[in-house]
Amino acid sequence: MASDKPLRLLLGFDYGTRQIGVAVGQAVTGQARELCVLKAQNGVPDWNRVEALIKEWQPDAIVVGLPLNMDGSPSEMSERAEKFGRRLNGRFNLPVFTHDERLTTYAAKGERLAQGQRDGYRERPVDALAAALLLEGWLAEHPD
């Protein structure tokens, strides 16, 4: 989905059926940071929480991670993530882009291991960090 408005601030979503990681990123720095993890019921978030994040951060666009298979083909979750993106666009009238999120959760767990976390992903989930990594990937591919 194209946008004529400069994309300065973006929110990234790492979509999941039980949890959705959220990150914020800036185009000027190309960096993103984790914000929060939203609980989801069968992939449906608390839309009031999503709306509160949109109002607080006022992003120019949204990036949703697209969970592709390792060969690049769509996964079972790909359609659900795309549907989530369409709902974000419909509810908030913001441009929504998808970005290949292969291995972001793996990379996020690797970062947490490097920080000393050995387990406890329920207590300290990696979803928001995965969202930050996928958002940084999108920003790197769209530098302007």
Curated annotation (Swiss-Prot):
GO terms classed as biological process: rRNA 5'-end processing
Protein name: Putative pre-16S rRNA nuclease
Keyword set, alphabetical order: Cytoplasm, Hydrolase, Nuclease, Ribosome biogenesis
Superkingdom of origin organism: Bacteria
Primary subcellular site in the record, as a coarse category: cytoplasm
Cell location: Cytoplasm
Family of this protein: Belongs to the YqgF nuclease family.
SUPFAM superfamilies attached to this UniProt entry: Ribonuclease H-like (SSF53098)
EC number(s) on file: 3.1.-.-
PANTHER family for the chain: POLYNUCLEOTIDYL TRANSFERASE, RIBONUCLEASE H-LIKE SUPERFAMILY PROTEIN (PTHR33317:SF4)
Keyword field contains Protease: no
Residue ranges of coiled coil: none
MF term (GO), any: nuclease activity
Chain segments annotated as transmembrane: none
Role noted for this protein: Could be a nuclease involved in processing of the 5'-end of pre-16S rRNA.
GO cellular component: cytoplasm
